């Protein structure tokens, strides 16, 4: 048989809040990073979205979006590498590990507080039955 229940104890202290609560944005100078991949077969172009887990307070300016091709040196705005992506405050940096032959980065498109979109296209000398394949990492830092 079960014994008599004891009195309820006192409630402990509430722990500290998490870093981000729903509705909050990425704090100033904080950085988010991620990985990306794009792949298709026999398409002339393909779009890739880059979603930021924690939204920014404002969308990245189009002049602050950068694409660093495999083998290119880092820049002042994007001092990182594909293995260690970095972005200076207010910058969005995409690092490509590989762009297969017949594929080029075209442009960044629509910008939102929660991400941006990029387009990749096949080059004129892409062989029949080609595939567009690329992958790498990205970083965004809030202003």
Q: Which stretches of residues belong to each language-model region?
A:
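Short, low-complexity N-terminal tether/leader segments at secretion or assembly junctions of large
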Residues: 1-4
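Extracellular receptor-binding modules and their adjoining Ser/Thr/Gly/Asp/Asn-rich linkers
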Residues: 7-143
């Amino acid at each position: 048989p079960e014994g008599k229940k004891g009195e309820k104890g006192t409630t402990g202290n509430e722990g500290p809040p998490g870093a981000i609560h729903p509705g909050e944005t990425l704090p100033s100078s904080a950085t988010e990073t991620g990985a990306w991949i794009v792949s298709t077969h026999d398409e002339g172009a393909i779009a890739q979205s880059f979603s930021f887990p924690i939204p920014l307070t404002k969308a990245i300016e189009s002049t602050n979006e950068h694409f660093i091709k495999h083998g290119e040196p880092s820049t002042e705005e994007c001092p990182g590498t594909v293995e260690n992506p970095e972005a200076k405050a207010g910058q969005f940096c995409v690092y490509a590990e590989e762009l297969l032959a017949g594929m080029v980065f075209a442009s960044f498109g629509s910008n939102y507080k929660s991400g941006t979109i990029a387009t990749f296209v096949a080059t004129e000398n892409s062989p029949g039955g080609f595939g567009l394949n690329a992958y790498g990492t990205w970083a965004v830092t809030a202003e």
